[in-house]
C-alpha cells in the first residue's frame, strides 16, 4: 500500500518530493523552532520549502529533486550525521522542489516498526527528536551555509538577500 500510494501520487505530481509523513516548522527569527513543536500535516498537502518530508513512513525523491550538494558526504557527516531527512530537506529547499504530503490515517506496520517497538531506543527518533538532535543538526546546516528562512520558506542569506538556486 505504501509504495503504491507514493507511485500513484508521483504520477500526478511527478516533480514533487512525495511523502506519507510531513510536518511544518514554526519559525522564529529565520530559524526553525524545536522540532517537537512542528505541526504534522493531517490532510493531503502540496507546497514548497516549509514542508518537511519525514523519513518515517516513506519518501519518494524523484530524479533531480535534490540539489547537487546532496552528494557532499563530508559535509553531511559533519553537519547532520544522524539526520538524512534533514539533509535531504535542505537539498530540496535549495532546489526549490515542491513537496507533496499524502496523509495516511492508518499505519502500515513494517518489519522496521515492529523491530523498533520491541527494541526501545533503536530508532533515530529517540535521539533526533527526544534528545533534540534534529534541532542541533538543522541549526548546524543553516549556520554553516549562512542562511535563514523567511515566513514563506524561502532561503535567505543572513544579510536578507534571497538565495538564487
Annotated model-derived regions:
Residues 2-73:
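Conserved catalytic core of nucleotide-sugar-dependent glycosyltransferases
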Residues 68, 73-165:
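C-terminal catalytic/acceptor-binding lobe
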Amino acid at each position: 500500500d505504501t509504495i503504491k500510494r507514493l507511485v500513484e501520487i508521483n504520477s500526478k505530481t511527478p516533480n514533487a518530493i512525495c511523502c506519507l509523513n510531513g510536518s511544518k516548522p514554526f519559525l522564529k527569527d529565520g530559524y526553525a523552532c524545536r522540532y517537537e513543536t512542528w505541526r504534522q500535516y493531517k490532510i493531503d498537502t502540496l507546497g514548497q520549502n516549509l514542508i518537511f518530508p519525514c523519513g518515517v513512513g516513506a519518501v519518494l525523491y524523484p530524479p533531480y529533486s535534490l540539489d547537487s550538494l546532496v552528494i557532499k558526504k563530508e559535509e553531511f557527516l559533519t553537519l547532520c550525521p544522524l539526520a538524512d531527512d534533514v539533509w535531504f530537506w535542505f537539498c530540496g529547499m535549495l532546489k526549490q522542489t515542491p513537496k507533496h504530503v499524502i496523509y495516511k490515517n492508518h499505519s502500515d506496520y513494517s518489519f522496521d516498526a515492529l523491530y523498533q517497538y520491541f527494541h526501545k531506543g533503536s530508532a533515530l527518533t529517540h535521539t533526533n527528536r527526544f534528545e533534540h538532535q534534529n534541532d542541533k543538526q538543522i541549526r548546524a546546516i543553516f549556520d554553516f551555509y549562512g542562511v535563514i528562512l523567511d515566513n514563506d520558506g524561502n532561503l535567505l542569506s543572513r544579510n536578507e538577500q534571497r538565495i538564487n538556486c
